Structure formats: structure tokens, C-alpha cells
Amino acid sequence: MAVQGVLTNEQFPCPPGNLPWSLADIKGPASYTQITPGAAGVAPTGGQAVSKEALGLPVSVLWAKSMGAENGQYDVVCYMSPFNSLAGSQTGLILQWMTSSTGAEVGGGVDLSTHTLRILAIGR
């Protein structure tokens, strides 16, 4: 695997605490839209959009991971939107909701508004 580079513009490598970390509880959407993958270098569409501001990060999101929903029924894959090579997203994330028991994406139109998940995000 070839390494493209290290995010030196974002002060990486760095000790913990050099950049803001955020924990945010995010409610699911009332009507989920399945992810449609983008072309190479293009963000996917659909899913649940979460802004950098909703994560408490005023400038950008560099990394994010979800703990999954409160009842264990769902997990989430976090995508940078847009993904900027060697930089962060100045917009936010797209969340792809997955059913924990099968690993399949949640169907379109499913109401996830009663579910909450926690996201750890690092940014600036």
C-alpha cells in the first residue's frame, strides 16, 4: 500500500490534545436516503449529512468514528464530504447507517429519528 502523505498542513503527526476533539450525539433522520457512491474523488450522495458545526468544529473535520446507535441495532460509516486529500472536510460528514446484525445498509425511507449515535471527531 502506497502512502500518499502525512497531513503536515494540519500539524500531524501531533501529540493528543494538539487539535480539538469533539463528541457529538446525533439523532437519525426521519426518512433515510441510501448512499449512492460518487466517482473517484467525488463524495457520495444520500445518507445523513452532518455539518462540521453540528460536531462542534468551526473550521474542518479531519477524522471521525461512530460508536453506533444507543440500542446496538445500527452502526454508521462516516465519510468526509467532500474528502480533501491531505486535508480535512470544510463541510462535514455523510453518515451511512448500517444494520448491525447483517452489515447491510438501512433501506431508503426508514425512520431513524428515534435512534441516537455518538461520533468522535477530530478537527480544527
Locate each region found by the language model.
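Extracellular receptor-binding modules and their adjoining Ser/Thr/Gly/Asp/Asn-rich linkers
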Residues: 1-49, 114, 118-124
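Extracellular attachment/recognition segments
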Residues: 36-112
